[in-house]
Amino acid sequence: TESPIPVPAPAPAAKPKPKRVSKRPASHPPYSDMIAAA
């Protein structure tokens, strides 16, 4: 039961990240911060 919980969490987080980077190149610096926070 622990497996299905962590799986859906990283999935939605990975989707909004690439979308923001594609739209705004300035999101690269904050992008690294988001990874470190995660």
UniProtKB/Swiss-Prot annotation:
Erythroid cells. It is found in: Nucleus; Chromosome. One of its GO terms (cellular component) is chromosome. Keywords: Chromosome, DNA condensation, DNA-binding, Nucleus. Residues 1-38 are annotated as: Disordered. Residues 16-26 have a biased composition (Basic residues). Its main location: nucleus. It comes from the Eukaryota. Residues 1-15 have a biased composition (Pro residues). One of its GO terms (molecular function) is DNA binding. GO terms for biological process: chromosome condensation. Histone H5 performs the same function as H1, being necessary for the condensation of nucleosome chains into higher order structures, and replaces histone H1 in certain cells. Belongs to the histone H1/H5 family. This is Histone H5. It comes from Columba livia.
